[in-house]
Amino acid sequence: MTAILDTIESPCDLKGVTQRELAQLAAELREKIITVCARNGGHLAPSLGVVELTLALHRVFDSPADKIIWDVGHQAYAHKLLTGRRDRFATLRTLGGISGFPKRCESSHDAFDTGHTSTSISAALGFAVARDLRGERNKVVAVIGDGSMTGGLAYEGLNNAGHLNKDLVVVLNDNEMSIAENVGALSNFLNRTVTSEFVHTMKKDLEGFLGGLDRIGHGVLKVAKRAEESLKGLFTPGMLFEAFGFEYIGPIDGHDTARLMETFEKVKRFDDAVLIHVLTKKGRGYPPAEEKPALFHGVGPFELETGKVIKGKGGAASYTGVFGEAIRKIAAEDERVIALTAAMPDGTGLTPFAADYPTRFFDVGIAEQHGVTFAAGLAAEGYRPVFAVYSSFLQRAYDQVFHDVCLQNLPVTFAIDRAGVVGSDGPTHHGLFDLAYLRHLPNMVVMAPKDENELQHLLLTAIEHDGPAAVRYPRGNGYGVSLDQTCSVLPIGKGEILREGLDGALLAIGSTVYPAREAAEALAAEGIDLAVVNARFVKPLDRDLILSLARTTGRLIIVEENVIQGGFGTAVLELLEEEGINGVKVLRLGYPDRYVEQGEQHELRAQYGLDAPGITARVRTFMKG
């Protein structure tokens, strides 16, 4: 039953809802979110944890005039349901459906697109300054989780915002994942909730009064502030945020709608920077998610009654799992190997490694920049660090890859998971740029395996290489090929011919190799005889092999699960130009110059012509042209 929710078309409709009805509405929101996530998958636990917070924000503030910016955005499902997207919520994270993250193009209530962490405070400050420049009076609210506070960008935003002292509200959603609990009765007393406008005004007036008493008043004010800060700093995070120039309020029960609304109503009258610390529970209202919040943080389809995740077909190992086992095998033979991750030990397959080698495993938090430079320092001291990271998140540390790793030619291995299209999380999470943004860095070796067995060999190849190396591999299961018991070093810059052919050559990299070979077999039945190459390396290229095929066949088809601009195909064109080879017809297959939408991996590959039937059709047209 969603009787109240069915009447909510916009946040304005919340104004007349009673406190009792708000409690019922919270239950209806949770029911809707759980039901849709059970079918579609999604970020269930974060969204369940902020239902009351979302209701209070939209009850008190006037979106879209007031701007609410959700950090990361995976906790915004209740927000979507309350802002006119209830009827489309069943399409969440599906091809053509609504996004799992805030999207400005989707609703005027989505003030800022998000998907990566720690961006909200900086963005909110931009909104606040723009408001002041226009002489307007609307409020700006950033909602950020404690996990996102491990990212340096959040503190850069806090530092600048506190310095400017703009009218800005930051809501710190502490869901017990990162920030420790406060200690003792004195702590509770010193950080009791300050929701009274009177108390806030009195403090300002007292500061003004003491400041006006010349030297004596200033002395008293300094002593009072030192005493307050010294005691508060012993027990609470309040001193930290006040040092940044924010008024600190909290902690507050994030599931007490009445208390939240009272606090927001009072803070709404303030005109300086305020941070409100709320305590919530991830997965609230769904026992399986409460018991295993990490599992249900981002989860696939699951059984509604039990919470059991529905497994896919077949028994092929995932690329992530193969990587995790391979690095354990390699580390057993090489004590120099150290594994690092940025808050993704499960997602990158490093949890077993952490159990086996706790002193050689480091989770740096949501801090990719730090992680890369940390790895560079380890490499400079003779270790062989492996930084396991999603392709999309490595983008956050590009300068560190350039300045701290490649410039010094340090042996850091980048194990780049989720390369290519990743599915329902959409454009913020697709890994479609790494081939392009890595291959032009001097000293960097860039490689991609055709299957899960080759992954473990390329991983060892990267670790043994005396310089920076990146191995990129897709999300999902492999092909079920047998896995060699030992890993071998492969010659760098050498591909392999999988099929001979005289009419042209398909040069494929990584996840496109198998569909390219399937396309070649289909075209052979039509009398089109194509060679198929597993390139393995985007940098350095197998120059001799590519040039030989260009000269003997006259037609090259390059296939990559990456943007076409600057990728593998571009590298081949540059090689042909450097060697002065003219008259070779080239077809580049990859993703176009746009941000690719959400959808299942197989749907997106079919839509962009990068599955076997799509490659077959496009190559057929090319060969007959």
UniProtKB/Swiss-Prot annotation:
What CDD domains does this protein map onto? TPP_DXS, TPP_PYR_DXS_TK_like
Residue sites binding Mg(2+) per the record: 146, 175
Q: Which PROSITE patterns match?
A: TRANSKETOLASE_1, TRANSKETOLASE_2
Keyword Lipid biosynthesis assigned to the entry: answer is no
Relay the cofactor remark from the entry: Binds 1 Mg(2+) ion per subunit. Binds 1 thiamine pyrophosphate per subunit.
Cross-referenced InterPro entries, in alphabetical order?
A: Dxylulose-5-P_synthase (IPR005477), THDP-binding (IPR029061), Transketo_C/PFOR_II (IPR009014), Transketolase-like_Pyr-bd (IPR005475), Transketolase_BS (IPR020826), Transketolase_C (IPR033248), Transketolase_CS (IPR049557)
Q: What is its EC number?
A: 2.2.1.7
- Names of required cofactors: Mg(2+); thiamine diphosphate
Q: Which GO terms describe its biological process?
A: 1-deoxy-D-xylulose 5-phosphate biosynthetic process; isopentenyl diphosphate biosynthetic process, methylerythritol 4-phosphate pathway; terpenoid biosynthetic process; thiamine biosynthetic process
Q: Which reaction does it catalyse?
A: D-glyceraldehyde 3-phosphate + pyruvate + H(+) = 1-deoxy-D-xylulose 5-phosphate + CO2
**What molecular function terms (GO) are annotated for this protein?**
1-deoxy-D-xylulose-5-phosphate synthase activity; magnesium ion binding; thiamine pyrophosphate binding
* Involved pathway(s): Metabolic intermediate biosynthesis; 1-deoxy-D-xylulose 5-phosphate biosynthesis; 1-deoxy-D-xylulose 5-phosphate from D-glyceraldehyde 3-phosphate and pyruvate: step 1/1
Keywords of this protein's UniProt record, alphabetized? Isoprene biosynthesis, Magnesium, Metal-binding, Thiamine biosynthesis, Thiamine pyrophosphate, Transferase
GO CC annotation: cytosol
Q: Which family does it belong to?
A: Belongs to the transketolase family. DXPS subfamily.
Q: Function of this protein?
A: Catalyzes the acyloin condensation reaction between C atoms 2 and 3 of pyruvate and glyceraldehyde 3-phosphate to yield 1-deoxy-D-xylulose-5-phosphate (DXP).
Q: What is this protein called?
A: 1-deoxy-D-xylulose-5-phosphate synthase 1
- Organism listed in the record: Geobacter metallireducens (strain ATCC 53774 / DSM 7210 / GS-15)
List the gene name: dxs1
